[in-house]
C-alpha cells in the first residue's frame, strides 16, 4: 500500500490529463459494448419489418454509427497521444528526481553500489514504470468496464448461461492472484541481473585500453558471457512463470467458449434461449475475452513497473549519510585556519579505525604535507575536510567553526581539490575549465589557463578552447589533463587547497610545468598536500608523517631529516 500511494503521488501534476484519459477510455469501451446491443435490437425488431421500413432506417443508423465511431476515434487519438505523453512526463520527473538524489548521496553510497545498477534504475526501470503509468490504469479501466458491461448484458440476455461463465472468471482471477507474488520475485531478479550486465559492460568499456593492452579480451568476454547467461537464466524463470500464467488463462478462455456453445445449445433445445441470443452471446464473449487477454498482458506490465518502482523507491528513500544540519550556516569570509581536533574515523561498514585521535592545525595561508606509506590514512584526512565522510569522533574546524555546523555547499565552495586521477567531462576544454566557475567569462577562463601553464598548448590546437577532449579526456596526455584540472581550481579561486598526489603519475617534464602551476596556485592559500616526491614535500611549512597510529612525526623537512626517524627512512627507501 505504501508503494501504491507513492506511485499515485506522481500523477498529481497531470490529474487533468489522467482523468480525461480515463473518460476517453470509458467512451471507447462503451462504444464497443453498444454495437452488439444495437445489432441485437436491429435483428430482433427492425430486420423483421418490411423492406421499405428497413431501408428507411438504415441511413439514420449509419449516421449514428458514423458519429459514434468518429467520437471513439478522437478518444483513441487522445488516449494514444496524451496518455503516452503523461507517462513520458512522469518518466522525466522520476528520472530527474532520481538523478538529483544520486547527486546528493554520500561517497559511502557509491562505495557500496556499482554504477551499472544505478544506470539500470535510471533508464530501464523508469521506462517500464512510464509504460505502466500510462497503460496500467487505462487498460485496467477499459477492461473492467468491458468485463462488467459485458456481464450485465450477458445476464440481461440469459442469466442461466451467465452464471457458469461468472464462475470461470472467478477461477481465472483466483489463479492470477496466486501467481502474482511468484511473478514479482522473478521480475525483481530479472532487474538485478540486467543491472549486472550493465555493470560488466560499463566496466569493460571504461577500461578497454587496459583490456587491450593486456590482450585480455577473452577474459572479459568470459566475464560478460557469465553475466549475460545469468540474465538469460533469470529471463527463463521469468518466462516460465509467464508461460504457465498465459497458458492457464487461455485454457479458462477456451472453457468459456465451450460452456457458451454446449450449455447455450442445451438452453436452446429446452426453449429457454433463442438462437439469435446465442449469437449475441458469442459477440459479447469476444468483447469479454479481449479485456481478459489485456489484463493477462497487463499483469506482466504491472510486475515490471512495480518491480522497477520499488527499486526506484529504495534509492529515493536512502538518506545521504552527509547532510546539512537543521541549523547549518553558510561559511563566509574564510581566512583558512584549519584544525583537526582528536579526529578518529572508521567507515560505516567496518569498525576498524583508519584514523585515531589525529590533531593538527594549519594557520591561514600556510601549507602542510602529509607523508607516509600507502594506506596510512592520508587521503582519508583530505576526504574529511570537505565532509565527503564525517568524523567518527572529534571535530574539524575552519576559522573555529565546526564543519558539521556549516552548509555543505558553502563548505565545498571554499575548498579546491587537485587529484592524481583527473576526471575530465566529455566536452570541450573550455567547458572543463569553466567547471570551476560555471558562469565564468572567456577572459577569466583564459586567465586561469595561463596560470596553469596550459594556455599556449590550447591555442596551438586547431579548435583552441573548443577542442573536444573525448570521454574522460582520452585525447589529452596525463600532464595536459592535470593542468586543465589545475586551471579549473584557479578559476574557482578557493581559500583552502587540497593537492592529492597531483604530480606522482607524471613524467619529469610534465611535473616541472605542473609544479610551477601548483606553487602559484598554493600561494596565500591554506594547503594540504599528499606527496611522495622530495621536490614536493620539502617546500611545505610543516610535514606530518602519517602512520597506522596517526601522526608519527611532525616538523619541517630539515627537522625531520635531523631527527633520523620514519621520515628520513621513508626518503631513503
Give the residues covered by each predicted segment.
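An intracellular "coupling" helix at the cytosolic face of ABC transporter transmembrane type-1 domains
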Residues: 16, 107-108, 124-133, 137, ...
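A short amphipathic helical element positioned immediately N-terminal to and/or at the very start
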Residues: 1-15, 118
Amino acid at each position: 500500500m505504501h508503494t501504491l500511494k507513492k506511485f499515485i503521488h506522481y500523477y498529481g501534476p497531470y490529474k487533468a490529463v489522467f482523468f480525461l484519459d480515463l473518460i476517453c477510455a470509458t467512451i471507447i469501451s462503451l462504444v464497443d459494448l453498444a454495437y452488439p446491443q444495437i445489432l441485437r435490437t436491429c435483428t430482433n425488431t427492425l430486420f423483421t419489418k418490411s423492406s421499405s421500413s428497413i431501408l428507411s432506417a438504415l441511413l439514420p443508423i449509419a449516421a449514428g454509427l458514423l458519429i459514434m465511431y468518429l467520437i471513439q476515434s478522437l478518444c483513441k487519438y487522445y488516449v494514444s497521444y496524451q496518455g503516452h505523453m503523461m507517462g513520458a512526463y512522469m518518466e522525466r520527473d522520476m528520472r530527474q528526481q532520481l538523478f538529483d538524489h544520486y547527486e546528493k548521496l554520500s561517497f559511502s553510497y557509491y562505495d557500496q553500489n556499482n554504477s551499472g545498477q544505478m544506470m539500470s534504475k535510471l533508464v530501464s526501470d523508469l521506462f517500464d514504470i512510464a509504460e505502466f503509468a500510462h497503460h496500467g490504469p487505462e487498460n485496467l479501466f477499459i477492461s473492467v468496464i468491458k468485463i462488467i458491461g459485458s456481464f450485465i448484458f450477458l445476464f440481461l440476455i440469459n442469466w442461466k448461461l451467465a452464471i457458469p461463465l461468472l464462475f470461470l472468471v472467478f477461477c481465472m482471477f483466483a489463479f492470477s492472484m496466486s501467481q502474482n507474488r511468484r511473478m514479482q520475485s522473478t521480475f525483481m531478479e530479472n532487474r538485478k541481473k540486467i543491472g549486472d550486465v550493465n555493470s560488466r559492460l560499463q566496466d569493460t568499456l571504461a577500461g578497454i585500453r587496459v583490456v587491450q593492452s593486456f590482450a585480455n579480451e577473452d577474459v572479459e568476454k568470459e566475464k560478460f558471457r557469465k553475466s549475460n547467461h545469468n540474465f538469460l537464466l533469470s529471463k527463463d524463470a521469468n518466462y516460465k512463470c509467464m508461460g504457465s500464467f498465459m497458458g492457464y488463462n487461455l485454457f479458462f478462455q477456451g472453457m468459456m467458449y465451450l460452456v457458451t456453445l454446449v450449455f447455450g445449445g442445451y438452453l436452446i433445445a429446452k426453449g429457454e434461449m433463442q438462437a439469435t441470443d446465442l449469437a449475441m452471446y458469442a459477440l459479447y464473449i469476444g468483447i469479454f475475452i479481449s479485456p481478459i487477454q489485456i489484463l493477462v498482458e497487463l499483469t506482466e506490465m504491472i510486475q515490471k513497473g512495480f518491480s522497477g518502482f520499488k527499486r526506484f523507491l529504495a534509492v529515493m528513500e536512502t538518506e545521504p549519510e552527509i547532510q546539512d544540519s537543521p541549523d547549518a550556516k553558510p561559511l563566509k569570509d574564510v581566512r583558512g585556519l584549519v584544525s583537526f581536533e582528536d579526529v578518529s574515523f572508521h567507515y560505516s561498514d567496518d569498525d576498524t579505525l583508519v584514523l585515531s585521535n589525529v590533531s593538527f592545525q594549519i594557520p591561514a595561508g600556510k601549507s602542510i604535507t602529509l607523508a607516509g606509506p600507502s594506506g596510512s590514512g592520508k587521503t582519508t584526512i583530505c576526504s574529511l575536510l570537505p565532509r565527503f565522510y564525517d568524523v567518527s569522533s572529534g571535530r574539524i574546524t575552519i576559522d573555529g567553526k565546526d564543519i558539521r555546523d556549516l552548509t555543505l555547499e558553502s563548505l565545498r565552495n571554499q575548498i579546491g581539490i587537485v587529484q592524481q586521477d583527473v576526471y575530465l567531462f566529455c566536452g570541450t576544454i573550455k567547458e572543463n575549465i569553466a567547471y570551476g566557475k560555471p558562469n565564468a567569462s572567456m577572459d577569466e577562463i583564459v586567465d586561469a589557463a595561463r596560470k596553469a601553464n596550459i594556455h599556449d598548448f590550447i591555442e596551438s590546437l586547431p579548435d583552441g578552447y573548443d577542442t573536444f577532449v573525448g570521454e574522460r579526456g582520452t585525447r589529452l596526455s596525463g600532464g595536459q589533463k592535470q593542468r586543465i584540472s589545475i586551471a579549473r581550481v584557479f578559476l574557482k579561486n578557493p581559500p583552502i587547497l587540497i593537492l592529492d598526489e597531483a604530480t606522482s603519475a607524471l613524467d619529469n617534464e610534465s611535473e616541472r610545468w605542473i609544479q610551477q602551476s601548483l606553487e602559484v596556485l598554493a600561494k596565500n592559500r591554506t594547503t594540504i598536500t599528499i606527496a611522495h616526491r622530495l621536490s614536493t614535500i620539502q617546500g611545505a611549512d610543516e610535514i606530518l608523517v602519517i602512520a597506522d597510529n596517526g601522526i608519527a612525526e611532525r616538523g619541517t623537512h630539515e627537522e625531520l631529516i635531523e631527527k633520523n626517524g620514519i621520515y628520513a627512512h621513508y626518503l631513503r627507501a
